[in-house]
Amino acid sequence: YELILTELESSSSSSSENNNSIIILADVDEKVFEVILRFLYTGDVPTLKKDEDDDEDTMKSILITANRFGVTELKLYVESVLVEYFLIPSRAAKLLLLADSHICALLKEGTMDLYASKSMEVIESNMEEWTKLKKSNNLLVELFVYASSGRHKYSSVVEDGNGTIDDVDGFDVTSLRERLQKYDLDVDGSRDMLIDRWKMYLRANDNKVEEVEFKKER
């Protein structure tokens, strides 16, 4: 809630109007903003209306707005809904562009996994969206490297709960987020950001263990 107020205040900082003035965010859908406020006050999450196209558009709008205002928990919830209910070949290219634009690691991984396993179906089922995707050279290269290198076969299985530095590059997004959340670390960001964050934690923890052992030896 404070983050939303911060943006609202910053958007009016150059205005000389008094504190009772109304701030209009023309590019924010009123119903979507209501969903975000309801989540912040009550914890209620948006529900699907069983109209696939309408539901998809609504969920994407909520995700974009939640990301804009820093409502991370809602953003991650909606991201998981998009992966579970809307990730099909005909929507993969569009969702990949969305995920890349708004740093949605789980959605991005899911769309790239789908491409890796059903590349021709993804391309042929929606040529218009695939054409848009091809305009993003960096993302296209990333997708091809991902699909051709076998990187989509991430594993969450390690001998211990946290894994070692060497294990981390093989974790999928869900595994990374679970471990980060366990220690109250930030779970938002790209997969590379999550990996760096978890490696930093492991290194810091290893240093603490070494320090304790050194003191014992003395």
Predicted segments, located by residue:
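Canonical BTB/POZ domain core
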Residues: 1-88
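Alpha-helical recognition domains of nuclear gene-regulatory proteins
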Residues: 3, 7, 39, 62-68, ...
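Generic recognition of well-structured, leucine-rich alpha-helical segments
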Residues: 7-11, 39-43, 66-69, 81, ...
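A broad, structure-centric signal for solvent-exposed, well-ordered loop/edge residues
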Residues: 11, 32-35, 114, 130, ...
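Eukaryote-biased feature marking scaffold/signaling PDZ-domain proteins and nuclear chromatin regulators
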Residues: 18-20, 28-31, 57, 69, ...
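Extracellular interaction modules
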Residues: 30-34, 133-138, 191-192
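Alpha-helical protein-protein interaction/assembly modules
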Residues: 45, 49-60, 72-161, 209-218
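Basic helix-extension-helix modules of the SAP/HeH family
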Residues: 154-217
